[in-house]
Amino acid sequence: MGLLPYKQRCFNINEAHLDDEVMTSCFRILYTHFNKLGINWGPAFSSLIGIVRNDGYLSWANNLCIYILKEDEERFKDELWAIIADGFEVIRYERRGLYYLRKDKQYIKIFILRKIASNVRHTGGSDFIFEQYLQDTTKWEFRGMIMFLQS
């Protein structure tokens, strides 16, 4: 497919505001792409808490956090062409496994989880997740989207 056009942008995610309707629309588009790929993915960190506890997003959240397993990263990168065609921008990429996407002034962080031990995954930053939580999931409905969330 060639090189993905990428222009690093200066942005301040701390000044971002998460709009409930617009973010749900963005989430729905990514949901369709990720499910088409058949990869292990899902909401993570504060986004997971908001979906389960509030059936929405946390009031102080300024982005949506999603995880993807390292072994699915190449398929995700191949799908980025279609995601960009749906109006998303890749506004930041870090080789440690962090992608920032933006659409309609909404920010999405995608964490690539690397296996660092038989039972532990790492985001490349300060966060660790037990493998068991990613494999033992619970079926969850969020605004018409059926997901398998970390148990």
Where are these regions (language model features)?
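Alpha-helical scaffolding within the catalytic cores
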Residues: I51-R53, Y93-L98, Y133
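Catalytic metal-binding acidic patch
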Residues: D55-R75, G144
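Metal-dependent nucleotidyltransferase catalytic core
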Residues: D19-C26, Y67-L101
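Helical scaffold of the NTase/Pol beta-like nucleotidyltransferase catalytic core
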Residues: M1-A44
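Catalytic cores of NTP-dependent nucleotidyl/adenyl transfer enzymes across multiple folds
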Residues: G2-Y6, T24, D104-S151
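Short, solvent-exposed loop/turn segments at secondary-structure junctions
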Residues: S47-G50, E73-E74, G97, K115-A117, ...
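Active-site nucleotide-donor binding segment shared across nucleotidyl transfer reactions
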Residues: Y31-L64
